[in-house]
Amino acid sequence: MKHFIGNDWDHVLAPVFESGEYHKLHVFLKKEYQTRQIYPDMYHIFTAFKLTPFKDTKVVILGQDPYHNPSQANGMSFSVMPGTPLPPSLRNIYKELYDDVGAQPVNHGYLKRWADQGVLLLNAVLTVPYGQANGHQGKGWEMVTDAAIKALSERGQVVFILWGRFAQNKIPLIDQDKNVIIKSAHPSPFSANRGFFGSRPFSRCNAALKEFGRAPVDWQLPPNPEA
């Protein structure tokens, strides 16, 4: 079995990692990283899976692909590296977080505290070329992340937070008899006022976890980003 991640995700995703299609993706990415500026750093590609093992995952916040500007992407959806200005979508997430559960905004965008509590911060596509949003869409990452979503869905008792049309296109992969889906508009400035603000995803998530008999997420981030 190939050990790309270093925890139980390697076993869960083994059929994908051992496939010819994944080998093609691996060859493509090797060339991309050698010839272009690709984000995140190759050692951070699987950070979301490394920080949140399969057995511990109780929430999924699904993004599209990584931030495509320098010093932003860190392998977790919506999260940015410490010391990086907050992207507009994350500012809006923090605003809703405060309005929903009273979590005090912080001046960094490093979301590791959530990941450590079982929140899988998953992008559907795990790499992106500099300045080219969706530049690696359709290159093969979807088979990995779709397999992860399906495996979690089959296990059950997961809350899937799906913001925007792209994330909601994954709903057919999720068994809604065994899991909870929380959906709204995307927190982007282009759509936040059309249903994201006021959607209360964080309190609704914790209410669903309580129904599952699982511990709620403490959404309050630390004032200083953790290393």
Curated annotation (Swiss-Prot):
GO terms for biological process: base-excision repair, AP site formation via deaminated base removal. It comes from the Bacteria. SMART domains: UDG, UreE_C. HAMAP family: UDG. Excises uracil residues from the DNA which can arise as a result of misincorporation of dUMP residues by DNA polymerase or due to deamination of cytosine. Its main location: cytoplasm. Belongs to the uracil-DNA glycosylase (UDG) superfamily. UNG family. This is Uracil-DNA glycosylase.
